[in-house]
Structure formats: structure tokens, C-alpha cells
Amino acid sequence: MKIHPTQSSALNNEHDKASRSELARRIARLGEAKFVDHDISIDQQLLGGQPDTLFIPTGTIDLSTARKLGIQTESQIYGGVVPFPFVGSKIITHSAFGDDPPIPAGWHHELGLALAPHVLSGWSAFTLDAVRAAALDMLGRTAIRLKEVEATAGLGQFVATSVKELDEAMAQLDEPAISKHGVVIEENLDDVVTYSVGTTRLFGEAISYWGTQRLTTNNSGATVYGGSTLHVVRGSLERLASLGLADELQQGIDKAIAYDAIVSRIYPDLLASRRNYDVAAGVTSYGECRIGVLEQSWRAGGASGAEIAAFEALARDPGRSAVTCMSMEIYGEVDAAPNGSIIYYSGVDPVAGPMTKYVMELE
């Protein structure tokens, strides 16, 4: 078996590449496989895909690419295959506002309606006019958050509580990117806890987990993703849901399971061995408590290192049923990882600056 992380123009900073390579090495070791570095060309991959090859793409891949790579089942990928590229993005979480004409081919209007009970209030839009109209529709009821679809790690988001702030936020949006990928307009929450709820299947084994995300400040002063702590059990999301956890957490798990089932029903060609959902719980600007799924991740992500550490711990002890693992991203410091941790990156990234990324088993 060989591991091929596929190439992408996104997530291509030095620390991203190093993290993907370390992740692939550890997955290869877990499956007693050969690791092939991410510098392999896509042409070589298209010629060399075999049933025993496991692909680790940077993002979700579409059906056409999956067929060229020989991917037919989720056991051949750590990540996901989607019928249309937009299905792998946060844009599917909400209905399109109005009769927005640039809605992409393959868009199902019933999806947003079906997901509505399980997500925050919001809209998706594909033109500046639609973004503004949707935002004005919501501003009378709540503060809003604009989210660029292609942005990751908490970047590309703007909060507006007034028309003036909306205009300032919209001035930062890229119109060609809106036409291509869309923008999410969503109610903004304060006092937010962001949960990670997910399941991953690798080499015939399955884990599921709930966890919390932490935020940090990057070297440019922006608030970004800083890591996750995952509480992992063997088995499916349904097994996780049966544990009788605290009410808010249970709601989050149930909503993630519903989101997963609805998208899988409407897009039956979806394949995903990694199904991770961000769930936010917080308070609206009018004091209402809200909880809902923000987005899906069917690709290698920030919490992937913690997931693989959990697989490793459970493989070492077949009688063990649960484990807690943590991923951490620290900006401004090199060699900040504690003893006993698994280092994914430690150095000075030419773009992101000095940083350390590591994973630890906690208990």
C-alpha cells in the first residue's frame, strides 16, 4: 500500500506541507504501508492509482478526479469525494438567498431547508448584491458574520452589527471569489464554544469523537485556529451519541449526525472516510442561546493529527475503548513542543512566521 497526498494550490505554506507529510507518514505506519511524498506529480498519481493505494488529498476531490485516480470506496482515501466541488465547502450549510442566478450546477434547494433545524440562521450567496440583501435581511434581528468560503483556520470572516460595518466588511470581499465559491452570511454568536464532532474510518477500524477547539493569535495579530482536544471512542457516531453526555454536547452530536445523514441522502455519491463537523454553541446579540453545525470537513484538517494519535493509542492496546488526544498550534515560538509530544512542525515558515505544531495523548 502507498500513501499519495495529492497536490493543491491551497494550504501550501511550508508548515502545511510538513504537517501533511508527517500525517501521511503516521497513517502509513499505522497501515504498514509505504509513504510516497507529496512532491509526486499528479500525472504520476493518475497513472499509478491502484486499489491498495490510500490517497490523502489536501481538500475534497470531485468524482471525475476520483475516477481517474481509481478511487471507488472510502477505504481508498483519508478524506472525501464529492459529486460537485462546492459540496465539500461550507456554502452548502444554508439555502441560497433569493433567486441568485450564479448558483452552481448540482445545487439542491431542498438541502438548505432540510439542514435548517440543525444549523445557525443564515444564507449563502453568490453575488455582492445577494450578499448585501441577505445581510440587510438579517441585521434587523441579529449581528451577522460574513464568511469567505475558501478561507480556513478562522480567517476570512467579518462581523457586522450595523449597515456601516456591513459596508466595511463587504469592501474586503473579493467579487470573483464570490461568483466562484460564494459567501456565507450567518448569525453571529458571542461567548462561543466550538465543538468538533466526527468519525474516521481507517484500515477497517472506526473511531468517533467530540472535542473542543481553541483559538490563538497568529504572527500577524489575527485570531485563528489553535488546536483541538478530542475525546475519542471506538465505533460510529451513533456509539458516541449513546454515551449520555451533557445536554449541550448531546445536542451538538445529534445535530452533526443529522447534518451528515441529510447531506448523504441528497448527495448519495458522497464518499468520506473522515467526517468532521464544527458545531458552535453561544448567545446571539439579542440574548438567545443557539447551537448549530457551522460546516463539515471531509479532508485532512487541523484535528487530524489528534485523530491519528488516537488510532495509534487504541492499536497499541486492543482492550482500550477510549482515549483523549490534543493538537496544538503555537505562533511566535519555535521548539515550543513539550517532551513526549509528536512534532508536526517546528520552524520559521516563510509566510506564517515562527511556529510550532504538535500532538499529544493526554489520557
Regions found by a protein language model. Give the residues of each.
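Short, charged N-terminal beta->alpha structural module
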Residues: 1-39, 107-110
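Structural motif
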Residues: 6-13, 56-61, 99, 188
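Conserved N-proximal alpha/beta basic substrate-recognition cap immediately N-terminal to
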Residues: 35-139
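Active-site nucleotide/adenylate-binding loops and adjacent lid/helix of ATP-dependent enzymes
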Residues: 93-183, 201-205, 217, 229-261
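A short catalytic or substrate-binding loop motif that flags glycine-/basic-rich loops and adjacent residues
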Residues: 150-151, 188-192, 269-274
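Phosphate-binding site of ATP-dependent enzymes
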Residues: 167-228, 276-293, 297, 301
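A long amphipathic alpha-helix within ATP-dependent nucleotide-binding catalytic cores
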Residues: 222-289, 316, 320, 324-359
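A short alpha/beta connector and helix-capping loop motif
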Residues: 304-317
